A protein has these predicted regions:
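Conserved, well-structured ligand/cofactor-binding cores
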Residues: 1-458
Length: 458
C-alpha cells in the first residue's frame, strides 16, 4: 500500500494514499481499534455531517464572504454533496467507540471534505479547520448531526413503514368484518369478538404510535449549531445560528430551527431520550402484534390455527414439512433490541457533565439502530407476512362455539352463579353449554335456543 504524509498539531502521520482523510482521522483509526469494520459511526451521522457542513459553508459565505469565497464555497458544496449521497462512505472508517464528543468524526468530515474540495478545485484552497469547520466546534456539530439524522430516520424511514402496515391492517379489517371468533384474555377463552375488531386493535395501536412519533420528533428539529465549544457561540458570527439552521432546513426539506438555549443543546440529550421512547413504544406494539399473529397461526393441527400466514421457507433441519412464523420471530427480536437500546440511550443521556455530554456517539448509534431496524422489520413483516394473512373460518367457528365463555350470554337469564355452574358442568362432563344448562334445569332447550346467540355478543 502506498502512503502520503499528512500533519496536524501533533505532528506527521502516514495516511493511505488513496484515502481522503488526513492526520486526525488516521490517529483515531489507529488509537481506537474497537469494533473496527463492524461498529463504525452510523452512515446516517456521516451523511448528516455532509448536510450540516454544506449549510455552514453557505451561511459563512453570506456572513464572512472575505473568508468563505465563492470559489471555496463551490468546491466545498460539491464535496458535501458527495458525502450526503454516500459516494464517499469508504472514507469514513472511524468507530463509535472513540471520544464521547464525536470530535474525531467531526474532523473526519472536515478532512475528507477539505481534501475532496481541493481535488475538485484543482488547488489547495480549503483547510479542514479554518474552512470546513469555520464557525463550528465538534461540540455543536455532533449534536446537530444527531438531530438531523434522527429526524430523517423517523420521518423518512420509520413513519412510512408504520403507515404501510396500518394500510395493510385496514384492508384486512374490511375483508374480515363478517367473522365472529372467540376472544381471549390471560391466554384463556373470553367472550366473542369480530376478527375485524381484533385487527382494528392492531391498527389503532400503530396509528397511536405514529402520532407519538410525530409528537416526539418535533423537539429534534432544534439544532445546536452555532453554540460552538460551550454554548456561548465563540468564533461564530452574529446571525450564524439562525442562518445555518435555515440552510439545513432548505437542504433537507424539514423545519429545522436553531435551539433557543445552546447550553442545553450541548449538554442535554433529553429530546433524544423522548423520541427514542416513542420508538420503543412502537416496538412494544409490534411485539404484541407479532405475538398475536404467531399465536393465532399456531399449529397447524395442535395449535389455535385460526389464521393462515405465508409459508416462506422450511422451518426445521430435522422435522420435514415444518414451517415457522419467521417474520414474527424477526420483528420480536428487533423489538427486544430496541428495548435494550432504550436503556443505553437513557444512560448515555444522563452523562452530561457541566457544558457537554460526552456519551454522544453511543447514544446516536443505539438511536439510529433502533429506528433503522424497526423500520426495516416492519416493512419485512408487512410484505412477507401481514399482507398474506387469511382467516381459517372453519377453525374460528369451531373454537367460538366450543368456548365455555359463551355462557356469559346466559347471565341475564339464569344469573352469574348458575351460569358458572353451567360452564363447570359442561367442562367436567365434556358436553355442550346447552346440554349442561338444560340438565341442570336452568332453562328449557327451546328457551336456551331463544336467548343464546353468540353472534349478538360482540
Amino acid at each position: 500500500m502506498e502512503y502520503r504524509i499528512e500533519h496536524d498539531s501533533m505532528g506527521e502521520m502516514r495516511v493511505p494514499a488513496d484515502r481522503l482523510w488526513a492526520a486526525q482521522t488516521q490517529r483515531s483509526h489507529e488509537n481506537f481499534r474497537i469494533g473496527v469494520d463492524i461498529e463504525t459511526m452510523p452512515r446516517e451521522i456521516t451523511h448528516a455531517f455532509g448536510i450540516l457542513k454544506k449549510a455552514a459553508a453557505l451561511a459563512n459565505a453570506a456572513l464572512k464572504p472575505e473568508k468563505m469565497t465563492q470559489e471555496k464555497l463551490k468546491a466545498i458544496c460539491s464535496a458535501c454533496d458527495e458525502v450526503i449521497s454516500g459516494e464517499l462512505n469508504s472514507h469514513f472508517p472511524l468507530v463509535v467507540w472513540q471520544t464521547g464528543s464525536g470530535t474525531q468524526s467531526n474532523m473526519n468530515a472536515n478532512e475528507v471534505i477539505a481534501n475532496r474540495a481541493n481535488q475538485l478545485a484543482g488547488a489547495r484552497l480549503c483547510h479542514p479547520n479554518d474552512d470546513i469547520n469555520m464557525s463550528q466546534s465538534s461540540n455543536d456539530t455532533f449534536p446537530t448531526a444527531m438531530h438531523i439524522s434522527a429526524v430523517l430516520a423517523i420521518e423518512d424511514k420509520l413513519l412510512p413503514a408504520v403507515e404501510l402496515l396500518i394500510g395493510t391492517f385496514k384492508r384486512l379489517e374490511a375483508e374480515n368484518d363478517d367473522i365472529v371468533k372467540s376472544g381471549r384474555t390471560h391466554l384463556q377463552d373470553a367472550t366473542p369478538i369480530k376478527f375485524s375488531q381484533e385487527i382494528s386493535g392492531w391498527r389503532a395501536s400503530l396509528e397511536r404510535d405514529a402520532e407519538l412519533l410525530r409528537m416526539a420528533v418535533k423537539p429534534l428539529h432544534e439544532l445546536a449549531l452555532g453554540g460552538t465549544a460551550v454554548g456561548t457561540g465563540l468564533n461564530a458570527p452574529k446571525g450564524f445560528s439562525e442562518l445555518v439552521a435555515a440552510k439545513v432546513a432548505e437542504l433537507t426539506g424539514k423545519p429545522f430551527v436553531t435551539a433557543e438555549n445552546k447550553f442545553h443543546a450541548l449538554t442535554s440529550k433529553d429530546e433524544l431520550v423522548f423520541a427514542h421512547g416513542a420508538i420503543k413504544a412502537t416496538a412494544c406494539d409490534m411485539m404484541k402484534i407479532a405475538n398475536d399473529v404467531r399465536w393465532l397461526a399456531s399449529g397447524p393441527r395442535d395449535g389455535l390455527g385460526e389464521i393462515h400466514i405465508p409459508e416462506n421457507e422450511p422451518g426445521s433441519s430435522i422435522m420435514p414439512g415444518k414451517v415457522n412464523p419467521t417474520q414474527c420471530e424477526a420483528v420480536t427480536m428487533v423489538a427486544v433490541q430496541v428495548m435494550g437500546n432504550d436503556v443505553a440511550v437513557g444512560m448515555a443521556a444522563s452523562q452530561g457533565n457541566f457544558e457537554l455530554n460526552v456519551f454522544m456517539p453511543v447514544a446516536a448509534y443505539n438511536f439510529l439502530q433502533s429506528a433503522r431496524l424497526l423500520a426495516e422489520a416492519i416493512v419485512s413483516f408487512n410484505n412477507n407476512c401481514a399482507v398474506g394473512i387469511t382467516a381459517n373460518r372453519e377453525k374460528m367457528h369451531h373454537n367460538l362455539y366450543n368456548s365455555l365463555m359463551l355462557v356469559t350470554a346466559l347471565n341475564p337469564y339464569i344469573g352469574y352463579e348458575n351460569a358458572a355452574k353451567t360452564a363447570k358442568k359442561a367442562f367436567k362432563d365434556n358436553i355442550s353449554l346447552k346440554e349442561a344448562c338444560v340438565s341442570l334445569g336452568f332453562l328449557t332447550a327451546e328457551r336456551f335456543d331463544e336467548v343464546f346467540h353468540p353472534e349478538n355478543m360482540i
